[in-house]
Amino acid sequence: MDKRHDPSRRIIAPHGTKLSCKSWFTEAPMRMLMNNLHPDVAERPEDLVVYGGIGRAARDWECYDKIIEVLQRLEEDETLLVQSGKPVGVFKTHSNAPRVIIANSNLVPHWANWEHFNELDKKGLAMYGQMTAGSWIYIGSQGIVQGTYETFAAMATKHFGGSSKGKWILTGGLGGMGGAQPLAGTMAGYSVLTCEVDETRIDFRLRTKYVDKKTDSLDEALAMIDEANKSGKPVSVGLLANAADVFAELVERGVTPDVVTDQTSAHDPLNGYLPQNWTLEYAAEMRKKDEAAVVKAAKQSMAVQVRAMLALQAAGAATTDYGNNIRQMAFEEGVENAFDFPGFVPAYVRPLFCEGIGPFRWVALSGDPEDIYKTDAKVKELIPDNPQLHNWLDMARERIAFQGLPSRICWVGLKDRARLALAFNEMVKSGELSAPVVIGRDHLDSGSVASPNRETESMLDGSDAVSDWPLMNALLNTASGATWVSLHHGGGVGMGFSQHSGVVIVADGSDEAAVRLGRVLWNDPATGVMRHADAGYDIAKKCAKEQNLDLPMLEK
């Protein structure tokens, strides 16, 4: 019997102000763990899989039940340790310490590969936490929509004179991360054609309004895109097809999109990418019989797709890797020039990271959407001079369906995160918000990740693979008084290719929370400015000086 599979489970986080734990500082991680497994949030909640191939919230259902049980009894001066989704210890600490410390899928570097991890996983000794799956702060596809929107907008500025009108994007994958692409693309003014092999994922994105139309015909999909471009009304199309097949077919036809990228779960060739000419059922069967054959076939198909991406780039398409490590997989399969198209971070996002700007997010523990709308208004009030941010908040309210507990993602940086959090805390204190909020971020942030094929690709000083930075980030956030802190390996790009840390903190309206919020949400983004200043980025050095960061080795 698979201890990770239970189709009878239907997890819904409690709403409102009634506590089932001893304080909001333990109620919050409990609700957020449960929210990660909400049927409208998780990809396969019956298997504890939240997103990203096999990114889980807990190691198995026995561990999940025990985590909930412990959180409900945890005292305000105790800390729960969670090792790869398993609650392994409760220790006496102090009231300002994190209530939960999480470490997921960390392996000694020599053994940090999928083969060794999969052996441990089979024995029930490990769990792949992805980024926000195992750290209990996943908010559905909204969590990546704004970052994707900002990237597509930056591509329009860089490649199309600032206008995306009449332009279209070709991409793959409609899972938990990839599902953001069609909505982000149309919000940025493009039409979007997304290939997906799992029809249930297309249907889910249709239901939540992330995708406009669905077809299983490439000809029909291209006709939809063409009609939308002529009418000036962007459309997103979910095409039931294998991305490798479609990308190669477009090269064959001489059809060149304006933008090409991909967000299939290529980081995990065993569980995340369907080889060409395979059905989902056959792949599931083969994973049990011959894992090596699945990996080989998946990588061969990735090589086909990447060769097509390179050909489309040569034909004039703006082509970028969107952080799933597909270039690395193709390179290992013999595509020597796989890295000839850039990753999205060095190409479009790094200047934001230099100012500590990244995917700040918050969740209304009340379950009341009005609490989020009130915080949206507060963000506009406190940041009045950022029309792009205001536009994002307006579009998000209009077009993004909440998944599970209501939440918001908002890319802000060092100068704004702490003051926004303190304002939210005051709103809880005054009763303007009906219950506390949790504030966190993706692990994809400026100071919390080392990932040479994604966030830290092509660093100015060559420090791409130095992972001291996320370790220091996690330790500093623990010392600063976050509510829960996580340290993971392999998120986004797969085992052996990244280390990263997460942080979440509760705003419960108390004066004590205000002190912790001010510390954590200043120190956390400040480590990103520090990391980029240390690497030699002038924008980061300027930001550090303007914000009076004490960086001993930075020239005054």
Swiss-Prot record:
Active site: C410
GO MF: urocanate hydratase activity
Pfam families, alphabetized: Urocanase, Urocanase_C, Urocanase_N
Broad EC category: lyase
UniProt catalytic activity: 4-imidazolone-5-propanoate = trans-urocanate + H2O
EC number(s) per entry: 4.2.1.49
Cofactor(s) annotated in UniProt: NAD(+)
HAMAP family: HutU (MF_00577)
Key word NAD present: yes
Matching InterPro entries: Urocanase, Urocanase-like, Urocanase_C, Urocanase_central_sf, Urocanase_CS, Urocanase_N, Urocanase_Rossmann-like, Urocanase_sf
Entry's Gene Ontology BP terms: L-histidine catabolic process to glutamate and formamide; L-histidine catabolic process to glutamate and formate
UniProt cross-references to PANTHER family, sorted A to Z: UROCANATE HYDRATASE
Organism: Shewanella sediminis (strain HAW-EB3)
Family to which the UniProt record says this protein belongs: Belongs to the urocanase family.
Protein residues bound to NAD(+): 52-53, 130, 176-178, 196, 201, 242-243, 263-267, 273-274, 322, 492
Pathway assignment: Amino-acid degradation; L-histidine degradation into L-glutamate; N-formimidoyl-L-glutamate from L-histidine: step 2/3
A single GO cellular-component term on record: cytoplasm
UniProt-annotated location(s): Cytoplasm
Protein name from the UniProt record: Urocanate hydratase
